[in-house]
Every structure is written in C-alpha cells, then in structure tokens.
C-alpha cells in the first residue's frame, strides 16, 4: 500500500506573453523553479520531501543556465543540443549528492530515459485532470511513500509560450532538424500553451 499526498502552495508564476530571446532566461527560471513549501498532513515530517524540493531547485537552476547559454549562442537548435548533453549530466550529479534519482518525466518524452513508471503516469494524469479543471500548476505537488519506505516526488512542468519554439505544433525547420538528429523517438512536440509538459521527479529507494 502507498500513502499519497497532494501538496498545495501559494507560489505563483507570472503571466507570460510572447517574449524576445533576451527575456528567455527569466521565463525559463519561472518554469523550472516554481517550487512549493506548504505542508500536507504528515508529509513535512519526512526530511526527504525537503530534500526533493531543494534538489529540484538546484537541478532547475543549473539546467536553466545551460539552456540559456545555448539559446544565447544559437537559438532553439543550440538549446536543444545543449540540453541533450547537460540535462542527464546535471541530473546524475544531483542524484549522487542526494542519494535519490533526480530528473524529469513525461508521458510524451523526448528522451526515452524519461518515460514514466506506472505510478508516475497515474500522477501525471492527475496533474492533467487538475489543469483541465482550471487549477494552477503552481498549487501542485505529488508525494508518495511506499510500504517499503521508497518515495516519489513530482512537480509539474507546464508549457509556457517560450516552450513552443521547441515543443509546439509548428517548429522552425532548423529546430525540427535538430530534434530529428538528436532524438530518434521524440514525442514531445505538438503542445499548446498551458498543457502539461511533464514533471520534475525525485525517486527515493526503499529503506
């Protein structure tokens, strides 16, 4: 049996319009670092919850910096190439430091390594249902502890306007070429603004 907590918070992301490349850094920061700290019943007594939040904050900051550098150098195609190398390396370093698996997951993944487990898929579907009902993603977290002491933390990632350059329904030819070159099994295009892209995740081993 598992006990599952949905954690709500009051951290709100700013409304974003269509932005020039110069404003890309701040938008990515908001998309990657919108984390919550309000307690759910019993959840805050587990130090792994705070560890999960901190690890994702650090992961998001490092990934944001790498993507921003790529975007500044060569727009979306360069950012895609940088992310393909940087994201796994950053996740591996965070995982080693935390003692848990840090990364991202999505039902429509770009990298198959990020495919969700059955439990994660259920949580992602719940996030999607809540978004469709009008709830803000800023209010959502998922914390699930197994009978064996393992745990899963998820935090949703939602498509913002700037994300559409690499994940939208219409891509620039050079962007599509970069995706096709680096991701043979890409499933992460065709999104519209406001849809669930996936989630940050931390998976803790059994105790």
What are these regions (language model features)?
Residues 5-28:
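Bacterial N-terminal signal peptides that target proteins for export
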Residues 26-36:
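Bacterial N-terminal signal peptides
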Residues 28, 169-170, 174:
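Conserved long hydrophobic alpha-helices within structured protein cores
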